[in-house]
Amino acid sequence: MAKLTQANEDYLEAIVMLAGADRLPVRSVDLASRLGVSKPSVNKAVTLLKEEGFIEQQPYGDIFLTDAGAAYGEAVLERHNTLTRFFTEVLGVKADIAENEACCIEHVISEDTFQRWTEHIRQSLDCCPAK
C-alpha cells in the first residue's frame, strides 16, 4: 500500500469520518466543506486517491471508500483520536492544542511505533492506576 502525503491522508481521514461506519457515499462538496478547501482541491485529491485504489467515484458522482481506503483512513483516524485523548486526558493539554498536535504526529508516526506506544500506555495505566 502506498504511503500518502499528509494532505491526502487528511482527505482520506475526512472521507472515513463523513462516510461513517456504514460507508455511506460522500459528496465532494461535503468533503470540501469539512476540510475548508476548494472544490478543485478536492477533485485533485480524489483523482489521486482513485489512482491509488483508495476510493471509487463515477465522473462527478459520490465518493465511495474501497476496503483499502477504509483500512488506511481508519488507521489514520485511530492514531488521531488516540493521540488526542492521550494529550488531553493523560497530559492535560488543552483540547485545541491536542487536536492540532495529534494531526501533525498522526502522519509521521509509523504503525509499528504507534502500536508499541499504545501497548506501553495500556500496560502503564493498568499497572499504575490513578490515585
Q: Where do the language-model regions lie?
A:
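Helix-turn-helix DNA-binding elements, focusing on the entry/boundary residues of the two helices
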Residues: 28, 46, 84
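Basic, amphipathic "hinge/linker" alpha-helix immediately C-terminal to the N-terminal HTH DNA-binding motif
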Residues: 61-80
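Basic amphipathic alpha-helical segments that dock to polyanions
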Residues: 11, 31, 42-52
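A short, conserved structural fragment
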Residues: 50-60
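N-terminal helix-turn-helix DNA-binding core of bacterial DNA-binding proteins
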Residues: 2-37
